[in-house]
A protein has these predicted regions:
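Conserved phosphate-binding/catalytic loops in two-lobed NTP-binding clefts
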Residues: 440, 458-470, 665-670, 677, ...
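Conserved phosphate-binding catalytic cores of ATP/NTP-utilizing and phosphoryl-transfer enzymes
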Residues: 248-254, 300, 322-329, 350, ...
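Internal gly/pro-rich beta-alpha loop/helix module
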Residues: 155, 305-376, 569-570
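A phosphate-binding glycine/aspartate-rich beta-alpha loop in the early core of alpha/beta enzymes
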Residues: 212-273
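A contiguous, well-structured pocket-lining segment that forms one wall/lid of small-molecule binding clefts
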Residues: 153, 164, 168, 175-177, ...
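Glycine-rich phosphate-binding/hydrolytic loop that grips phosphoryl groups
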Residues: 468-489, 493-495, 534-543, 644-645, ...
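Conserved phosphate/anionic-ligand binding catalytic regions in large, soluble enzymes, centered on
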Residues: 205-219, 310-321, 490-500, 566-587, ...
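Intrinsically disordered, low-complexity, mixed-charge
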Residues: 1-168, 172, 176-179, 190
């Protein structure tokens, strides 16, 4: 028989397991990688596959097994692993996964890998970040720079060893190594990791190279100085902690949050912080992003440190991708640099998520969770190149939509270059030849040039997809829903009327959408300036209400009044939250993406519904400005909750009314505002009370990181 097996079957010890099972059953034959698949030719039958499924490695996943008759040549006397073919393309490898308990114990022990940071086996370690192309063999990864020593070669060839056919097997004799240098590039004596740990303990700012990129490292008691040095005034930092006991010292995670934190994927998880966590780590928030070590280096670092927690934030120039180059990183001006000589092929930031019950809301889907895909069942090759903020691209092949790692915000040339590199790499891995390329409707987005060039290269059609329709399509694609009424709520997206949308009630399928209602339009005084100077939003609302304005001087008021007449309009839920945040004294200036909305969450969580915030729909607009007239009469938390509840209630009522008339039983929630747990709770409450099923994100990012999935789904539907 010939068995072609599809799934996560490369780089996880799958072929060695096939070998061991076949040998134990006395079978003859061969097993090989073939692009994205594994092909087994053997004299075994279905019982062999049943046994194989029962003994799968921890990281492996069999998705399908195709069987065909095959006469094994008499010349094959035994069972063996043979060289890879390359007739099939696709992503069948696992993500980078945290060092496993066996390798951790070995690294902390007294054997030949004692203290060796690159200790891994078939069950753990870097994969995607080291990989150039399929199939996953050592010569197609950056580990080809490090030929195996005899001892590692012996492990690689031993069927009983957990490093049997482990493509990145190495040791201190033959593998990558760390070095420690000062701010001028001069070597620092001593064990690199131990010395780096002592310098961090002493209050220095360091940069450490890991899998997929580099981190800026600091102790928690140096956060104010770190903010001044790095130029990050308010944006929260992620905190890496030594172990689960330390998580519980600083935070109150739910069981689901702790399960994600301790998973092999090791994302940053937003958890409720305790008073023991310094407030300046995540100012004005009731949560903090926390994660556990996932590399050997990080475990060794905490073994040597006196502190049990450290700031670990991506090392990059603001607005640019995370730095990979050892020379370029010196420009950041840290006190010391812990660097290694293993080439990073694919950059990957840490994944970031928050949990709403069992639903995973990915704020950033990257290291540990990519490559990944969703099955959509629509044939054809297509690419979606995403929006401008929180950029990703997606590539469709064989009924699946595969997404790139998190790219970043696309205003800079460096981010657009990174988008091109990551997308081209994924296209190559999948063997995709797109017939259609989808991009955002906004005419000014910097990635459009790449999209057009990509389409020209393949002779593909180019389509433009409205931003909030793409949000809806991303939710439909991951949930397997053909059509739905949905709330698509975020900061901004170019509308078909030329205005900035963002508070939308829609009916959508993959061929069209209807805009059922939207939040009241308000002027964006000064355009993009209003996104940061959020008093402009409050000023615009007070103009609509005819309210006295006492928070700007007369000259500024005159400038704002004149500018409002020619300003673009916005229906954004994000801008509505910004205006609330300013009105309630929560936030005066937006210094990072989503800041006012994030700082509203603690208020929303504590608030109760009070009378006086009821609203109505007038000519398709859900009225909001009137809520600000008497907002100061109420407790801040009650005003915040009641205003948001009133708007969500009216949006859900509008969606439910349409859904009832058209036999639809599901109502979705998508867009960046849906990351707010209180807003998700309010949405679910009203949807279920009205007798509908809420549809929420779990695998595709709620925010703009999921836009490319929706674009690609819409593009695929066009090909059918």
């Amino acid at each position: 028989m010939r068995f072609t097996i599809r799934g996560v079957v490369q780089g996880v010890g799958f072929r060695p397991t096939v070998y061991r099972v076949a040998k134990s059953m006395g079978l003859r034959g061969t097993v090989r990688n073939d692009g994205a698949y594994v092909v087994i030719e053997t004299d075994g039958n279905a019982s062999f596959i049943d046994r194989l499924k029962a003994e799968l490695p921890a990281l492996a996943l069999i998705e399908s097994v195709d069987c065909e008759e095959y006469a094994l040549p008499d010349s094959v006397k035994d069972f063996s692993i043979i060289g890879s073919g390359n007739t099939a393309r696709g992503v069948g490898i696992p993500t980078d996964t945290a060092i496993c308990p066996k390798c951790l114990a070995e690294m902390r022990g007294k054997g030949r890998r004692s203290g060796y940071a690159f200790t891994t086996c078939t069950e753990c370690g870097a994969r995607f970040t080291l990989m150039e192309t399929n199939p996953y063999d050592r010569e197609r990864t950056s580990m080809r720079d490090f030929p195996m020593c005899p001892e590692c070669g012996s492990e690689y060839a031993d069927p009983t060893d957990r490093r049997f056919h482990h493509q990145t097997v190495c040791c201190p004799k033959c593998g990558p190594s760390y070095r420690l240098i000062d701010h001028d590039g001069g070597p620092i004596d001593g064990d690199p990791i131990t010395t780096f740990a002592k310098m961090i303990d002493a209050g220095r700012f360091g940069i450490a190279k890991s899998w997929g990129g580099m981190h800026i490292c600091s102790t928690l008691d140096r956060v104010d100085e770190l903010r001044e040095w790095y130029g990050r005034k308010q944006k929260p930092f992620a905190v890496m902690v030594k172990d689960v006991e330390t998580v519980l010292k600083y935070a109150e995670p739910t069981e689901a949050e702790l399960r994600e934190m301790t998973s092999p994927h090791r994302p940053i998880v937003l958890v409720r912080k305790k008073d023991t966590m310094p407030e300046n780590v995540s100012p004005g928030l009731d949560t903090v992003g926390m994660f556990l070590p996932y590399t050997g280096m990080q475990y060794l670092l905490f073994d040597a440190m006196q502190h049990d927690a450290a700031i670990m934030t991506s090392a990059n120039v603001p607005g640019e991708p995370m730095i990979l180059n050892d020379e370029e990183i010196m420009e950041l001006g840290a006190d010391m640099y812990l660097l290694h000589n293993q080439r990073i092929i694919n950059r990957a930031d840490d994944s970031v998520m928050k949990l709403f019950g069992e639903n995973r809301y990915f704020l950033r889907k990257s290291r540990g969770h990519i490559p990944s895909y969703i099955d959509i069942g629509l044939k054809g090759d297509a690419v979606g190149i995403g929006p401008q903020e929180n950029l990703t691209a997606s590539v469709a092949k064989d009924g699946r939509i595969h997404s790139t790692q998190h790219i970043g915000n696309g205003e800079s040339l460096g981010v657009v270059d990174y988008l091109e590199t990551a997308t081209d790499s994924l296209i190559e891995m999948l063997g995709c030849k797109p017939s259609i390329v989808a991009m955002d409707l906004h005419p000014g987005y910097s990635n459009r040039r790449y999209g057009k060039a990509l389409a020209e290269r393949f002779g593909a059609e180019v389509i433009e997809v409205q931003h909030h329709w793409a949000h809806c399509a991303s939710l439909m694609a991951e949930s397997g829903t053909g059509e739905m009424a949905a709330l698509s709520i975020d900061g901004t997206g170019h509308g078909t009327d030329g205005n900035a949308w963002g508070g939308e009630v829609m009916f959508a399928d993959l061929t069209k959408f209807d805009r059922l209602a939207h939040l009241q339009y308000i002027p964006l005084i000064g355009g993009e300036k209003a996104l940061y100077d959020i008093r402009r939003l409050k000023f615009a609302i007070d103009m609509i209400n005819g309210t006295d304005i006492d928070y700007v001087d007369d000259r500024t008021a005159d400038v704002f009044t004149k500018a409002a007449k020619n300003s673009a309009l916005t229906s954004s839920f994000g801008r509505f939250l910004d205006a609330l945040a300013y009105s309630l004294g929560v936030c005066d200036v937006r210094s990072y993406d989503g800041e006012p909305a994030m700082k509203m969450e603690p208020l929303l969580a504590r608030g109760k519904k009070v009378e006086g915030f009821e609203t109505s729909v007038e000519n398709g607009e859900i009225m909001t400005a009137h809520m600000f007239r008497d907002i100061s009469k109420y407790r801040k938390e009650d005003a915040a909750y009641s205003a948001v509840d009133a708007v969500i209630t009216k949006m859900v009522e509008t969606a439910a009314d349409y859904a009832s008339k058209h036999g639809i039983r599901k109502i979705g929630l998508t867009g960046g505002v849906s990351y707010s747990i209180p807003i998700s709770q309010i949405f679910v409450k009203h949807v279920t009370e009205m007798g509908f099923k809420p549809v929420l994100h779990d695998r595709v990012p709620n925010g703009d990181g999921g836009i490319s999935v929706g674009q690609t789904a819409i593009a695929l539907k066009r090909l059918q």
